[in-house]
């Protein structure tokens, strides 16, 4: 039975559970158990603190884990990323009072407050900077106002919290993060584990694409195929209407409206976009 770690709370947990549910796995239910056995699919899920998941996976106690890249890096556990999940996106950055001119070189000898001390220490070491790293478990943004730190290093999603405290980020992102599936470093993905990953990829693909159906005059096929090439080419079927064909093709979701505009200009009719539930390529 495959053992998989899932975040036990927060936005990462909610999104991970949703994607696993769509992939056909048993949910956690309302009892908030620390583990759930899905006998039908041969998987046992363990609900752990996101910060601890990489440690369990690196020790070989669990086969796979879903957590944030930044959290996994801060644990300094030995792991490999096997799949990016396209949710939980953020950047990890330095920030200082707005209006002050800062760059990474000016961190020499300064106090840096953060909830990710190892990520910060590794970044400072890579840049040859000696600074004091102050670990805080939360509310990092207020530390400068209270005189605890000169700058902070924190997760930035929208930047709203920083602005509310009169702070602004500086320098390039230390880490660009998102939710990822991880495995112990040096271990290959097994056939059973690959089934899990394939199911998840199928959900991610479905979220990324829509199915487009439309009718068009056969003589215009070269023009519309240039707009909708699909992954390996469109599916084309003859219609009862002489000289016309039906076309079915997948297009990236974010481009669907622009593509439909172009098709309409080219004379296509009955243009329909449909959501996909699962899509394996």
UniProtKB/Swiss-Prot annotation:
Its cofactor is Mg(2+). Belongs to the ATP phosphoribosyltransferase family. Long subfamily. Its EC number is 2.4.2.17. Pathway: Amino-acid biosynthesis; L-histidine biosynthesis; L-histidine from 5-phospho-alpha-D-ribose 1-diphosphate: step 1/9. The keyword Transport does not apply. This is ATP phosphoribosyltransferase. Catalyzes the condensation of ATP and 5-phosphoribose 1-diphosphate to form N'-(5'-phosphoribosyl)-ATP (PR-ATP). Has a crucial role in the pathway because the rate of histidine biosynthesis seems to be controlled primarily by regulation of HisG enzymatic activity. It catalyses: 1-(5-phospho-beta-D-ribosyl)-ATP + diphosphate = 5-phospho-alpha-D-ribose 1-diphosphate + ATP. GO terms for molecular function: ATP binding; ATP phosphoribosyltransferase activity; magnesium ion binding. PANTHER family: ATP PHOSPHORIBOSYLTRANSFERASE, ATP PHOSPHORIBOSYLTRANSFERASE ATP-PRTASE. The gene is hisG. It is an enzyme of class 2 (transferase). It is found in: Cytoplasm. InterPro entries: ATP-PRT_HisG_long, ATP_PRibTrfase_cat, ATP_PRibTrfase_CS, ATP_PRibTrfase_HisG, HisG_C, N-reg_PII-like_a/b, N-reg_PII/ATP_PRibTrfase_C. Keywords: Amino-acid biosynthesis, ATP-binding, Cytoplasm, Glycosyltransferase, Histidine biosynthesis, Magnesium, Metal-binding, Nucleotide-binding, Transferase. One of its GO terms (biological process) is L-histidine biosynthetic process. SUPFAM superfamilies: GlnB-like, Periplasmic binding protein-like II. GO terms for cellular component: cytoplasm. Feedback inhibited by histidine. Its main location: cytoplasm. It comes from Corynebacterium aurimucosum (strain ATCC 700975 / DSM 44827 / CIP 107346 / CN-1). It comes from the Bacteria. Pfam families: HisG, HisG_C.
């Amino acid at each position: 039975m495959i053992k998989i770690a899932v975040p036990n709370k927060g936005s990462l947990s909610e999104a991970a559970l949703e994607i696993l549910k769509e992939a056909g796995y048993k949910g956690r239910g309302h009892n908030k158990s620390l583990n759930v056995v899905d006998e039908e699919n041969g998987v046992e899920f363990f609900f752990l603190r996101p910060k601890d998941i990489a440690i369990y996976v690196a020790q070989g106690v669990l086969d796979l884990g879903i957590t944030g890249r930044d959290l996994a890096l801060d644990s300094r556990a030995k792991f490999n990323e096997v799949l990016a999940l396209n949710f939980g996106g953020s950047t990890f950055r330095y920030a200082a009072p707005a209006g002050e001119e800062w760059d990474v070189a000016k961190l020499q000898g300064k106090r840096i407050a953060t909830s990710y001390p190892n990520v910060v220490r590794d970044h400072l070491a890579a840049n040859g900077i000696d600074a004091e790293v102050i670990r805080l478990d939360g509310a990092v943004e207020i530390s400068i106002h209270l005189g605890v730190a000169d700058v902070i290093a924190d997760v930035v999603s929208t930047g709203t919290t920083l602005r509310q405290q009169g702070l602004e980020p500086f320098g390039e992102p230390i880490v660009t993060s998102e939710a990822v599936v991880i495995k112990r470093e040096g271990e290959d993905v097994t056939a059973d584990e690959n089934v899990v990953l394939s199911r998840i990829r199928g959900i991610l693909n479905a979220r990324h694409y829509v199915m487009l159906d439309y009718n068009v005059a056969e003589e215009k096929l070269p023009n519309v195929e240039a707009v909708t090439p699909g992954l390996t080419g469109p599916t084309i079927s003859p219609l009862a209407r002489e000289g016309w064909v039906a076309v079915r093709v997948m297009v990236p979701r974010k481009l669907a409206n622009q593509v439909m505009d172009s098709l309409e200009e080219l004379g296509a009719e009955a243009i329909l976009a449909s959501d996909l539930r699962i899509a394996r390529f």
